[in-house]
Amino acid sequence: MVDTKTPGDKTLTMPTKTLTLKPRVEQGVVRQSFSHGRSKQVVVEKRGKRRLGGDEPAAPAAPEVAKKPAPAPAAPPRQQQSRPAPQQSRSGMVLRTLTEDERTARATALADARVREIEERKQAEIEAQRRAEQEKIEKAEREAAEARRKAEEERHRQEDEAKRKAETEAKKRFGDAEPAKKPAETSTTTTTAAPARPATTTTRTPTPAGRPPAVAAEAGDDDEAPRMIRRPGGPARPAPPPKQPAAKPGASKQRGRLTVVTALNADDVRERSIASFRRRTQRLKGHASNEPKEKLVREVVIPEVIAIQELANRMSERAVDVIRLLMKQGAMHKITDVIDADTAQLIAEELGHTVKRVAASDVEEGLFDVVDDSTDTEPRSPVVTVMGHVDHGKTSLLDALRHANVVSGEAGGITQHIGAYQVTSPESGKKITFIDTPGHAAFTAMRARGAKVTDIVVLVVAADDGVMPQTIEAINHAKAAGVPIIVAINKIDKPDAKPDRVRTDLLQHNVQVESMGGDVVDVEVSAKNKINLDKLLEMIALQAEILELKTNTQRPAEGTVIEAKLDRGRGPVATVLVQRGTLRVGDIIVAGAEMGRVRALISDQGETVQEAGPSVPVEVLGFNGPPEAGDRLAVVENEARARQITDYRAHQKREKSAASVSGMRGSLEQMMTQLKTSGRKEFPLIVKADVQGSLEAILGSLEKLGTDEVAARILHAGVGGISESDVTLAEGFNAVILGFSVRANKEAAAAAKRNGIEIRYYNIIYDLVDDIKKAMSGLLAPTLRETMLGNAQILEIFNISKVGKVAGCRVTDGTVERGANVRLIRDNVVVHEGKLSTLKRFKDEVKEVVAGQECGMAFENYTDMRAGDIIECYRVETIQRSL
């Protein structure tokens, strides 16, 4: 095909020249058929093959085909008709309608085409190198195959030669008839095979111009004769035809081929058939099933204990695999068994998962001890705890500071409740919070709580009494809490007051006052006459300045429950000392295993307030139940968090009580204790008190009364009045109900009277402890004391008909009394213990016989007496024991 170029044609240049496609010389239209009856017309361009003159011997025949009249005139009209078309499109339709965007797009396409051309050239070079290497390898293989073929032919030739020699000898033997026939067959075969060899060199007839190339190729293939292959020593066989792709009709050969017309016609798009889509889906499914699934790494949350089945579910693993790993570690388990967190972590990490350890106590994280920013802190009032021995004047000193009278309100004139008050210093005007603690031995826990929440401890010591046991205990509490001590030597107005003796006694307990060269401040005061009270307040304020007490008032409140009780009209009431933040009405609070919402705040003066800042003692109303004294109080953000914390604490409390009651898996010491207490008598009690602190002190005192033989068994202890349920419980165990500063309601009193249940009321803890001690002493077994009366020696045994055997004895020591206990000793061995049934002297019954006299004795239910035995006479006394 020859391309001609007119002067109007433009070459491909950038950026003004456009990229156009020159039409082929021959064009045709073919209708394509698709599935479901669809079809469309496609313009087909026919390209002629360029043939070189030296390649094929059929080249001289080309002019003869060109001289034929049929195809010659048909070619020029097609060229004349096809040439003006590009000129018209270039002159009138392409260049005049091109926009700047189209020019830019075509320039971009041209640049991309150049890049692709460079890449294709590189790929072609690489492919050429690869083909050269492949041809070299194939050539070596062909040479090796040719060498093998020649060796094989040589071997066959030698075999044929040997056969021919054998046949020649056979012909000579059997005659000339068969040898004559054999050459004829051989010549016939040779003649038949001879024309087959030139057939391989026959050439195909050139394709006429008017016939499609596909049809010409088919005709040429049909005209070729089969090529014959002849091997040495064997008949000629037709060679297999070369493998060629199956020829298709001209129209179907262009089917699916992307041409310019097809690409520009966007409306007619070939669609995938449903069967093709199904095959593709099946193929993708097959590939997906054959590919190995990637293992998912999960974050496994592991609590303190977890069941094997639950662990497997959280890891999305099989429980069998988990048990197999445990077996490798030497542990045999079932899927329902529970394992600890460490073992579960090892299993999860072995299986390639990440572990997140959690504990039930995590609900309390961030509840307390949150560090405050130093820029948000403000000074706060000091908290001062007054401690000392009973009757040393602690409450009287506070009354003098507060200008109030609290002592008269306490039963017996002693403090049995812990109280918190605020006092304003007359000189500085600053407030000081005082906490009063009981002094007697029963309230050790109260004193310990007071020392924990305080900043300064005021140790009150009576000048006339000196250092006492509870004074020493208060010193130990203050040292354990790490708070400074101020010694207040009280009752200096008494004539027998000796302040110097108090200072000297304190040295024995590592409390060195300033007058003795130490750093502990001491002040001589008198609560009764109000002497040096202002100096005491001044020393407290000075110590508070040294401590630099600051806190953040805008944060959620934290505090400590000092006292708790169950009020009949107000419900659970807790006395709380706010330590950090500000407690407001409506806050959701948690203290121990109890929660609630603050309904009211009552100050120490009995006034209702809306908020309480740091170091302020208030009564809090709104708890669900009375908390325990000493519990820490905190404000939480919502009720859900508060419920989580209280549920966890209640669960912990139940577990502790269950473990103490069951005693299972206890230590050896616990087992020995249970053996000791197995035969111990119990005194059942039900204790009800007004406040939690008093109840705690009573229970501690009753526990100390117990011995190895008898102990108090507390069936129930609580805060509040005596109810009918308490009476019902006491009836089942025949228990005594103790009420401390509380009374039974009408129904409970009637039920107790009807069922014969004893209810005892007390206001002073000493009286309660003394009465219970006496009652428990009645359960103790009495002590038996043996008193020796005298000894007698048996001289002779007499048989009396009505009495039986009677021993004639002489009293050698002391006296022998009738009815006394006797012990028969033979050869220094006690053979009988009993009582004297008869004591006679000269046929008369007597009450006693003194030493040196002779008498007759008979034993109760015993007659085996011999001469020479010794009789000991003694008296047994019963002595009642007490705790």
From Swiss-Prot:
Keywords: Cytoplasm, GTP-binding, Initiation factor, Nucleotide-binding, Protein biosynthesis
GO MF term (any one): GTPase activity
Subcellular location: Cytoplasm
SUPFAM superfamilies to which the protein is assigned, alphabetical: Initiation factor IF2/eIF5b, domain 3, P-loop containing nucleoside triphosphate hydrolases, Translation proteins
Region described as G3: 436-439
Taxonomic superkingdom: Bacteria
Domain tr-type G, first and last residues per copy: 379-548
Biased composition (Low complexity): 10-22, 77-89, 185-218
Claim: Nucleotide-binding is one of the keywords in the record: yes
Binding positions (GTP): 388-395, 436-440, 490-493
Family: Belongs to the TRAFAC class translation factor GTPase superfamily. Classic translation factor GTPase family. IF-2 subfamily.
Protein name: Translation initiation factor IF-2
Source organism per UniProt: Rhodopseudomonas palustris (strain ATCC BAA-98 / CGA009)
